[in-house]
Amino acid sequence: MTDKIIQQLEARINDLECQLAFQEQTIEDLNGALSQQQLQITKMLDQMKYVVGKVKNMDSSNLADPSEETPPPHY
C-alpha cells in the first residue's frame, strides 16, 4: 500500500472513531432523558390515581339539587 492510501485509511478510521464516540455520548444522553421522563410519568400517574380517588370519594350531598339553585342573573 502506498503512503497516501494508508493516510486515507487512517483518516477514515479516525473519522469513524469520532462518530462512534459522538453516538455513544448521544445514546447516554438519551438514556438519561428517558429515565428522567419515566420517573416523571410514574409520579404523574400516582398523582392522577390520588386525584381520581379523591373525586370518587367526594360527598355529593354537599352539592345542591339543580332545581334548588337560584337562576343566574341575566344581563
UniProtKB/Swiss-Prot annotation:
NCBIfam families recorded: PRK04406.1
Family the entry assigns: Belongs to the SlyX family.
Domain of life: Bacteria
Protein's name in the database: Protein SlyX homolog
InterPro entries with a match to the protein in the record: SlyX
Species whose genome carries this gene: Vibrio campbellii (strain ATCC BAA-1116)
Disulfide bonds: none
Coiled coil: none
